[in-house]
Amino acid sequence: MLIRKNLFKSFPQASHSQRKKIKQAFYQHLCDLLAESIKNISISEHELKRRFKVSNYSVLNKLYAEGKDVLLVSGHYNNWEWMITAQNLLLKHQAAGIGMPLSNAFWNKKLNERRARFGMKILNANNLQNYLCSDHPKPIATLVLADQAPGDSLKSYWMNFLNQKTAIFFGCEQLAHQYDSAVVYFVINKRKRGYYKVDFQLICDQASDMYYGEITEKHTKLLEKAINKHPEYWLWSHNRWKRHIPENLTELKTEQQAKFEKRFPNIKKKVTQEIKQEINSENPKLARYAKF
């Protein structure tokens, strides 16, 4: 029922048969993921590197040479678990990953042991700040899967995603500004069953050069593009749209932006068309906006 509902709202123009075809393809892919998750328990370093490859190292190698920490952002698309496990084998940066602990302590420990066995550092709300603020022998690449429903609709970034108003996790953008990290989007492409290739795309190397919301808008739209191309590879079984749209959304967005720009005063500011016109007419009252 949830999968059918998500597909209907995301692809309202598609026919019933088209959505049914996507659902069937998703179930087939989900079976592959389950088998690959079991394989992930015992897969060797050699076998994982043979099955999971990088298509372009240049983006991250340049940032590594510059000593830049990176936020790697994507969603639950294709085999994200293999990406988590393989990241420290594939990239020069020290791998780290942010996630919510499972409610079952036993399975949470087992899952994180599998994820961390090749060097991935597992982070959560309790150890994130200490780890990112500590000194490290090499730059860090912190992986964030930012497509799950946020915990609080009033602290989310609201935007259109898959044809509907959606609450987006805003933590990635906050971390980028707080720790002066570069932001890189990654997409995992399925070459064939059990074989993947990850592609990296730079969103920004300097968060302060981006407008409020621009980082979030960009990585979300890139994920949306991937989903529209191959919808069967996204996790449709997640209750993505369970947050209700706030009644005062316009006022909320204005307040959120004001607070964010106060916290990070060096962020690039948007200038409305009206202000630009008055600046161009040399209105002295608006001289303070010229630096934007």
Question: Where are the language model's segments positioned?
Answer:
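Membrane-anchoring hydrophobic helices of lipid-metabolizing enzymes
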Residues: 1-74, 108-113, 119, 264-292
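Generic structural marker for isolated residues within well-ordered, non-membrane alpha-helices
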Residues: 4, 84, 111, 172, ...
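Non-catalytic C-terminal accessory region of glycerolipid acyltransferases
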Residues: 21-24, 62, 90, 126-292
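A broad, low-specificity signal for short, low-complexity segments enriched in glycine/proline
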Residues: 30-35, 58, 83-85, 94, ...
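A generic secondary-structure micro-motif detector
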Residues: 49, 73, 100-101, 162, ...
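A conditional alpha-helix N-cap/helix-loop micro-motif detector
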Residues: 50-54, 104, 122-125, 165-166, ...
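Catalytic core of membrane glycerolipid acyltransferases/transacylases, capturing the structured
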Residues: 66-126, 151-157
